[in-house]
């Protein structure tokens, strides 16, 4: 069944969200949400569940490298794996949940902590590496989200959403393959708290220690891989800055950069 569409997003600033987190003593890294031109040191994180091994362990390290190459962000090269109960969870605006199989639900206490993380400004990027839509991982993800965010059902992210222009201007959600032609999300307080792709995004990013891509990208080859990297960059920038690209000043920045920076889309 094709998911319903999210309502068109309305403008919300990142600062009120971070202020609420800081006031609650939850967010330990002020200054992450900054406009283009400033540097922010970030560390990418993956949510670690006991029965869900990382199917693409080199992907986040490669993404960290690409973030430094493509943006003004300064990224810690080594990602971190975090259990749902870890207090470090609240130091990371964006956390990845990836898998290629079904998994068990976390404990009630861990579910409550994830709910708090997503409610107070955190973003969960979910990436299926199953190679098809609607598999065991997908079923487990939907069950998890139903417990973490009861009443909020994943819905299709509309083409007009600011996520598609948070850094690069994009029109699709590529990965190692194209299992699902749409992106899903869950909104909280008019922002995407969950971003869900079934196209094995991390499979397109993974690169071994010898500099070789670990997986072929089909059907679009290296152009599709490049689009996957651009989408991953957009997700990171969205999680850090939310919808600042709706401001005309940033639209102007994109257009100037496209004219002056080789290889920019």
Residue ranges of predicted features:
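Active-site-proximal beta-strand/loop segments in catalytic clefts of secreted hydrolases
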Residues: 47-50, 97-100, 127-130, 158-159, ...
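Aromatic-Pro/Gly-enriched surface loop or interdomain linker
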Residues: 29-94, 101, 201-202, 209, ...
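Charged, often glycine-rich, active-site loop that binds/positions anionic groups
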Residues: 91-99, 166-173
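N-terminal secretory signal peptides and thylakoid transit peptides that target proteins
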Residues: 3-25
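Alpha-helical scaffolding within the catalytic cores
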Residues: 79-84, 107-113, 179-181
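Short alpha-beta junction capping motif
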Residues: 94-138
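An acidic, glycine-rich "communication" segment
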Residues: 131-229, 233, 258-262
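Extracytoplasmic/secreted envelope proteins and their assembly/folding machinery
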Residues: 57-64, 111, 115, 138, ...
């Amino acid at each position: 069944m094709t998911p319903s569409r999210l309502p068109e997003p309305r403008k919300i600033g990142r600062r009120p969200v971070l202020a609420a987190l800081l006031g609650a003593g939850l967010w330990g890294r002020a200054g992450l949400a900054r406009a283009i031109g400033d540097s922010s040191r970030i560390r990418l994180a993956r949510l670690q569940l006991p029965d869900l091994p990382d199917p693409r362990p080199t992907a986040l390290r490669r993404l960290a490298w690409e973030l430094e190459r493509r943006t003004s962000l300064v990224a810690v090269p080594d990602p971190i794996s975090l259990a749902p109960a870890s207090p470090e969870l609240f130091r990371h605006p964006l956390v990845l949940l990836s898998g290629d199989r079904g998994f068990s639900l976390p404990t009630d206490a861990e579910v409550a902590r994830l709910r708090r993380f997503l409610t107070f400004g955190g973003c969960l990027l979910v990436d299926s590496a199953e190679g098809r839509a609607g598999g065991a991982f997908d079923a487990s993800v939907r069950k998890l989200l139903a417990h973490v965010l009861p009443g909020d059902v994943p819905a299709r992210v509309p083409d007009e959403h600011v996520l598609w222009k948070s850094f690069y201007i994009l029109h699709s959600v590529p990965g190692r393959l194209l299992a699902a032609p749409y992106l899903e999300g869950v909104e909280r307080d008019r922002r995407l708290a969950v971003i869900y792709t079934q196209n094995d995004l991390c499979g397109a990013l993974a690169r071994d220690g010898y500099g070789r891509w670990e997986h072929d990208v089909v059907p679009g080859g290296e152009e599709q891989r490049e689009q996957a990297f651009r989408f991953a960059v957009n997700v990171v920038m969205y999680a850090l800055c939310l919808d600042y690209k709706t401001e005309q000043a940033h639209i102007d920045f994109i257009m100037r950069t496209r004219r002056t920076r080789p290889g920019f889309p």
